[in-house]
Amino acid sequence: MSKLKLEILTPNGVIYNGEALSVTLPGEEGEFGVLAEHSSLITLLEAGVIDIEKEDKSVESVLINWGVVEVDEKKVIVLVEGAVAIRGDSESAVAKALNDAKELIESIKDNNPAIATVTARLESAAQNLL
């Protein structure tokens, strides 16, 4: 399966920069998936979870508050205001990421009625790491 280049950027820096087999994004009209050779598009993203399928078939999740994505045949560039990668090498690192993600959710809670879904996906992603 072909790979694509993925960058997730915030005003504070890079959250993810690497290759992926697929990316699932929380679009304004609903979730959508992107594979290599995808048609070009630019669209808004709402609060949700970006799932990144890596070459080893593992999935990394990144919680975002909102942003925009540009897709072309070889790369995906995601620009977001706030994001937290749900990852860590230890239980304490995962717990810190989970706490940071919950703080991000609190900051957007009033703006998004689908926040319960985001919270459930966040908890699921954290459990997969433990």
From Swiss-Prot:
It comes from the Bacteria. GO terms for cellular component: plasma membrane; proton-transporting ATP synthase complex. The keyword rRNA-binding does not apply. It is a peripheral membrane protein. The keyword Cell membrane applies. One of its GO terms (molecular function) is ATP binding. Belongs to the ATPase epsilon chain family. NCBIfam families: ATP_synt_epsi. This is ATP synthase epsilon chain. It comes from Sulfurimonas denitrificans (strain ATCC 33889 / DSM 1251).
